[in-house]
Each structure stands twice: as structure tokens, then as C-alpha cells.
């Protein structure tokens, strides 16, 4: 947890004091196998990537350190992050989908569940949603579902 903003924080796995990335020496990076980071309000503010965050992602790429970003956003909303940012992968939909940049401006998509399970879950979700809409006055479905591949 080298990148913590709290200078007195400690990495639970190593017992090493953590510090901002900008304060890390090249020798500190030898112990880092990779970086996993949240997207919303960690790399981004108001939906846009912070310039310092993008610079840090590029620095990690140049150092050969893999970076995986993680978000609850739908697959379709996550593709631009996976293709435009220097990432090795992006995990979306709360872990259900991995987007892996193909190096040609596209992404390969891998799922945590097989297709049969995903279809079953989608049918069940539709059944439950229809029941809620029938039985709960004023209920409405969330509007972030377009672009979502799993539920």
C-alpha cells in the first residue's frame, strides 16, 4: 500500500509504512507486483480522470508495473476507461466482468460466470423487477442499466 495518502498508514500484508507515490524511491517499486485501484472518486472527480492520476498511471506503465482498475460501473460505461487509460485490465460490474485492452483500441471481455448462469440470473432479475414494480407503489428501475452485461 505504498500509495496511501496517510503517511502513518501501514500495509496490512507487509507491515511497511505507506506513503504517497510521489515520495517513493525507485527501490520501493521493486517490491510491487502490481497496483489495483478504484475508479470513481479515486482516479476520477466528477466522472473525469484527474491529471495527476493519469500521470501516475503512465508512470506505472513506464515502470512495468501492471495496473488493474476496478469499478461497479456497467461494461459499456467502462470501455472508454479500459481503452483510453494505460491499464492492463479493468474489472467492471462489481467484479462480474473484466475488460482487457487488446492494444488496437478495443477490449476483450471475460466473465466471472458462464453464459448459462448469466442468462439464468438475468431472467430471475427481470422476474423480481417486474414483481417489485407491480407490488411496490412508486417503485422505478435504476437508469444505469444500459451497457450492463451481468446482474
Language model segments and positions:
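Non-catalytic pre-domain segments flanking phosphatase-related domains
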Residues: 1-37
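Conserved PLP phosphate-binding loop immediately N-terminal to the Schiff-base lysine helix
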Residues: 46
